[in-house]
Amino acid sequence: MASLSELARLGFLDPQRIAELDPDVFLAACREQPAVHRFPGSMATRIQDLCAVLVRDYGGDGSRVWTEATDAADLAARLGALPGFGEMKVRTVMVLLHRQYGVDLPGLAERMPAHQTLGDVRTAEELATYQAGKRAAKAAKRAASA
């Protein structure tokens, strides 16, 4: 997948400009190698939809999603309202914000899982370890139900 710096192939990373960009132009940028996602078509649409919500609801400033949240429940609701954010992504982003970026809202620490999550991953090595652990857990679950 492409990194944010590689997405600069557009020449900008501004939510308003991305939201307003012709979808075909944005899709072409998302498909350039390395692609943004293994499904660049659906991800291009999701990114543009997300940018449109950030512009409409947060003035184009994504950090307002968490800086203006009043507590953990409000943060979860704000994240869950974003296009493409299901329950798992909401939990992951909340862990990331709390553990890696120091966001500290009432009730947030109590929502943190005791086990490692994707939101705890900081390096490629940690990602490989995390993914191996997930694969092993899935294999054990399949074996137990067989």
Describe the predicted segments one by one.
Residues M1, A19, P40, E87-V90:
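Alpha-helix N-cap/helix-initiation sites
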Residues M1, L54-G60, Y101-L105:
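Short helix-capping/linker segments at secondary-structure and domain boundaries
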Residues M1-G11, Q16:
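A positional/architectural concept
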Residues A2, T45-D49, T92, L96:
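Amphipathic alpha-helical interaction segments
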Residues R9, A35, H98-R99:
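Residue-level marker of structural boundaries
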Residues F12-A81:
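Alpha-helical ds-nucleic-acid-binding substructure associated with the helix-hairpin-helix region
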Residues A72-A81, E87-A146:
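C-terminal accessory module of base-excision DNA glycosylases/AP lyases that mediates lesion recognition
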